[in-house]
A protein has these predicted regions:
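Active-site mouth of glycoside hydrolases
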Residues: 1-137
C-alpha cells in the first residue's frame, strides 16, 4: 500500500463520522489486565456496555492493552479478536493503546486487587512495568 497524499488523506477524513468516544474499561475489570485475561474477560458485559455506548451516540472507545497479556499470545489474540468483533457489532471503532506509564508500577498476571474506595484508578497498572523499564536502562 502506497503512502496517501495529503489530498487523499483529507478526502478520506471528510467521509468519516465525527469521532465521539471515551476511555473504556468494562464494569467487571479494575485494570487492563483484568479486562483481557481469559479468567475475567466477559463478552456479555462488553456487549451490553458497548451497546449502551452506541445507543448514547459514541462511535469510538480508547482501550488500554497490557504487555503482560502477550505472555500467552494466542489466547490474547483470540480474546482481543472477540473484543474487536463486539466493537464492530456496535459500530464502535476502538483506539488500542500499547503503553501507559501511569499508576501502579509492579503489574502481574492473575487475580487483581480489589478496588480501593475513593481512590481513582486504584488498580491500574503501568505497561510496561517498572522491572522492564529498569532492565532497559542498563542496555
Amino acid at each position: 500500500m502506497a503512502k496517501w497524499s495529503e489530498s487523499e488523506a483529507l478526502a478520506w477524513y471528510k467521509e468519516q463520522d465525527w469521532i465521539v468516544g471515551c476511555n473504556y474499561l468494562p464494569s467487571n475489570a479494575i485494570n487492563q489486565l483484568e479486562m483481557f485475561q481469559p479468567e475475567t474477560f466477559d463478552s456479555e458485559i462488553n456487549k451490553r456496555e458497548l451497546s449502551w455506548a452506541n445507543n448514547l451516540g459514541f462511535n469510538s472507545v480508547r482501550v488500554y492493552l497490557h504487555d503482560l497479556l502477550w505472555n500467552d499470545p494466542e489466547t490474547f489474540k483470540d480474546i482481543l479478536d472477540r473484543f474487536l468483533n463486539i466493537c464492530d457489532q456496535n459500530n464502535i471503532r476502538p483506539i488500542l493503546v500499547l503503553f501507559d506509564d501511569c499508576h501502579r508500577p509492579f503489574p502481574k498476571l492473575g487475580i487483581q486487587p480489589k478496588p480501593v474506595t475513593g481512590v481513582h484508578n486504584s488498580g491500574w497498572k503501568q505497561s510496561p512495568g517498572m522491572a522492564i523499564v529498569l532492565s532497559l536502562i542498563h542496555i
